Amino acid sequence: MQPPPRKVKPAQEVKLRFLEQLSILQTRQQREADLLEDIRSYSKQRAAIEREYGQALQKLAGPFLKREGQRSGEADSRTVFGAWRCLLDATVAGGQTRLQASDRYRDLAGGTGRSAKEQVLRKGTESLQQAQAEVLQSVRELSRSRKLYGQRQRVWALAQEKAADVQARLNRSDHGIFHSRTSLQKLSTKLSAQSAQYSQQLRAARNEYLLNLVATNAHLAHYYQEELPALLKVLVSELSEYLRDPLTLLGHTELEAAEMILEHARHGGKATSQVNWEQDVKLFLQGPGVFSPTPPQQFQPAGADQVCGLEWGAGGMAGESGLEKEVQRWTSRAARDYKIQHHGHRVLQRLEQRRQQAPGREAPGVEQRLQEVRENIRRAQVSQVKGAARLALLQEAGLDVQRWLKPAMTQAQDEVEQERRLSEARLSQRDLSPTAEDAELSDFDECEEAGELFEEPAPPALATRPLPCPAHVVFGYQAGREDELTITEGEWLEVIEEGDADEWVKARNQHGEAGFVPERYLNFPDLSLPESCHGIDNPSGGEPTAFLARALYSYTGQSEEELSFPEGALIRLLPRAQDGVDDGFWRGEFGGHVGVFPSLLVEELLGPPGPPELSDPEQMLPSPSPPSFSPPAPTCALDGSTAPALPSDKVLDCPGPLDMMVPRLRPMRPPPPPPAKAPDPGHPDPLT
């Protein structure tokens, strides 16, 4: 059976796509800057040689035509590149009539530079990187929630399987020699309670995953439909202003200077006047496919879970998932975003008026304030889009969203109207109160200082394990690559770092050999039990007891009773008598040999709660073999009309802001094959 195709982490895919977008955009901006520099260089040379006649002028235009032919630009006359080529052709045709335009070309050469273009590019790139970082953060939150959901589903499925196995044995009265029917009934009741608890945890994790999924879809749609075109509009429209004036001047100069090439000059001027950012952006987006929206992402059920929608608790009321609280929270957020946008637009109008009337020394401060208000409005729009997607999904799940949404929006509209009247009253008394305008503009600052703008709910903490940590091999595995490690059932490993792909970790065996092993073939004692079960296995309530030790130094036994081991070896500690005296020597097992060794030469590793000598052998039942490998479960669509999203995956490696440098691609590893047999009864799973 062939393994499933390799998967790429969603954040890495999004990050690479964003890097491609920035690279293409910067390449385009560089081409436009080169074009601007070409116009400037062309004008300077044209002013210097304008007094020469036809042949000299044709020699001047020839290199530019050749250079334009080598440039991979657009031939459409509605773009700046097409208009530039038309003007070059007109220059060749009217070379002998350019004497009188020398002064005008000299002025054009001095007024056209690339510093303004570089400033526009820097500002637009910063805005684009910030928007991309927010999208990437949403994808990271989606990956974390999906990983938690997958963990909860695996724990629930394992509990269901064990409960069914015990119940089947109870029905067959197959309690064996070491168990009685009463002990099997108690164990069945315990496993049923655990299964119900894990089912509730699975429902909460699934609901959180679904909410983050639709929010990420909405955020991605908003980015591709609103933010990206707006940023391109700023970049291209300002560039069009810088290019349109010199190109128009060139065209008018041609018309005024030459009667012989009047038709050519008019054609160049018409082509220049047709240049606009909308058509330029449209043609630019039709070229590369990087800026096209990603396809909608579908919900991917984990394992045997086939529930594809939000789920209420038992009894018809919202249970621990808190769906009604989610409705109340996001309706309040929608009302707040509505107020922020309306207030922000009113503040923008006041700032625009102040910028027109402000003296030169105050203009930079007003411009900075304008950028801050626009950024707050944009963030409110993003929050509104994500909240609307969540509310739509909650309404599809059967919750009465309008019950909370209508009162919240009505109250928000009333507050907006009240603020508008108060603002008009302040402005009408400007002569009597000079600070009325400042009070109007400070309302937005008060909202920002409150610290409640755009607060996203913190995602639930995932179960993490400190590295390095011990692990018990449940199934053997034969290495298939040079960087993988062969493991045998029953041995102990030390996990030293996360793997380079999903379902793989890097571990070191007792002989100091390190390599990648399948994560599902290992049992991590320190994470196998929930907190609610600790009190059952460790009634004394003491600190966890170490059952594994790492050798800090190599040691050679001085007698047959002593144990020899190399540096870095993992030694399994054997139980000691509870009332024994610690003489500085411990008893352990390494490499199939049992013996004593000095305790000062090793470092204890914490194991599961409760010492080994307190384990109840009657509670140890053989675990059934895990399910065989199956292809990925079919996906189900949440909403056909929702925005696109990216495939979910495990939690990402980089929680920080978006790094715009090219990342180091890590090799992808296919999922491990299914285990060959069931675990050893001597090493039962902690759930039983």
Swiss-Prot record:
Annotated localization: Cytoplasm; Perikaryon; Cell projection; Cytoplasmic vesicle
Species in which this protein is naturally found: Mus musculus
Protein name per Swiss-Prot or TrEMBL: F-BAR and double SH3 domains protein 1
Region (Disordered): 607-688
Domain F-BAR positions: 12-280
GO terms (BP aspect): apoptotic process; gene expression; import into nucleus; inflammatory response; membrane organization; positive regulation of actin filament polymerization; response to hydrogen peroxide; response to peptide
Residue stretches in coiled coil: 360-386
Assembly with partners or alone: Homodimer. Interacts (via F-BAR domain) with SNX9 (via SH3 domain). Interacts (via F-BAR domain) with SNX18 and SNX33. Interacts (via SH3 domain 1) with WASL. Interacts (via SH3 domain 2) with ITSN1.
GO cellular component: cell projection; cytoplasmic vesicle; cytosol; perikaryon; protein-containing complex
Gene3D superfamilies in UniProt: Arfaptin homology (AH) domain/BAR domain, SH3 Domains
Domain SH3: 466-527, 544-607
MF term (GO), any: lipid binding
CDD domains in alphabetical order: SH3_FCHSD1_2, SH3_FCHSD_1
This protein's UniProt keywords: Cell projection, Coiled coil, Cytoplasm, Cytoplasmic vesicle, Lipid-binding, Phosphoprotein, Repeat, SH3 domain
Superkingdom, natural source: Eukaryota
Domain observations: The F-BAR domain has an atypical, flat shape and binds preferentially to flat membranes. Upon heterologous expression, the isolated F-BAR domain is localized at the cell membrane, and causes the formation of cellular protrusions.
Tissue specificity: Detected in inner ear vestibula and in the cuticular plate of cochlear hair cells (at protein level). Ubiquitous. Detected in testis, liver, brain cortex, cerebellum, spiral ganglion and tongue, and at lower levels in the organ of Corti and utricle in the inner ear.
SUPFAM superfamilies (alphabetical): BAR/IMD domain-like, SH3-domain
Residues annotated as transmembrane: none
Biased composition range(s): Pro residues: 623-634, 668-678
Purpose: Promotes actin polymerization mediated by SNX9 and WASL.
